[in-house]
Design a protein with these regions (language model features):
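Extended, histidine- and acidic-residue-enriched regions that form the cofactor-binding/catalytic faces
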Residues: 1-94, 100-214
Length: 214
């Protein structure tokens, strides 16, 4: 790519996490989702896709095996520095996060970007009520990416009433010993492809958003 072309290009940055997703999905589920959405967008728009940022703020999963979490402060600071380093090469960054726990960190990144004059946008998957973690949504998307990623025989339902408030107070382990918040039993690859098409369209809308005049 010629250097002079880079100044008006958009960079998609997949942001994930490394945390439990029940017994049936991999620890890298959120990173796979974010990377898949970015790659889907790259098939319909001329954008660049950065290597995935595979860790995030996942303190709510404390106590489950395999957790690697940076926390909100470190995640935000790392991504602020990423924006600063990218500004000479790309005129717009779109962070595509597969993990809802990154919301506060990315909100901080956007706030700093606005002050410093950078064009930074953020996208998160739309969640279905009662299906926030390792349920039908994420399981379907991973089935559409590669069925070998999903151990369907291990999928279990777990969505206690009022789980959102409880999770914020006590963490996921206190309300769901399996780590699942949702029902993966109805997951299908076709459903995953439908979700991906919708999510791709949402990110494309961000890519196509009119730019501020510098």
């Amino acid at each position: 790519m010629e250097q002079q072309q880079r100044g008006r290009r958009t960079l998609l940055v997949p942001v994930g996490s490394f945390e439990q997703h029940g017994s049936h999905l991999p620890l890298t589920t959120d990173t796979i989702v974010a990377t898949t959405v970015c790659n889907d967008v790259a098939t319909v728009r001329d954008v660049d896709v950065a290597p995935a940022f595979p860790y995030g703020a996942s303190g709510e999963h404390e106590g489950f095996w395999g957790l690697l979490s940076l926390g909100t402060d470190a995640t935000a600071q790392a991504l602020v520095e990423l924006v600063r380093s990218a500004r000479a090469s790309w005129s717009r960054l779109v962070f595509v996060s597969g993990h809802g726990g990154n919301f506060e960190a990315l909100h901080r990144v956007v706030t700093v970007a606005q002050v410093e004059g950078d064009d930074v946008l953020v996208w998160f998957p739309t969640d279905h009520e009662g299906d926030a973690h390792a349920g039908v949504t994420e399981t379907s998307v991973l089935l559409s990416v590669d069925p070998a990623l999903v151990r369907e025989e291990r999928a279990v339902f777990a969505a206690p009433e009022g789980w959102m408030a409880q999770a914020r107070r006590s963490g996921v382990r206190a309300i769901s010993p399996t780590g699942v918040l949702g029902d993966p039993s109805d997951a299908t690859a076709e459903r995953g492809r439908t979700l991906r098409a919708r999510w791709c369209g949402e990110v494309v809308a961000l890519v196509d958003r009119p730019r501020r005049e510098s």
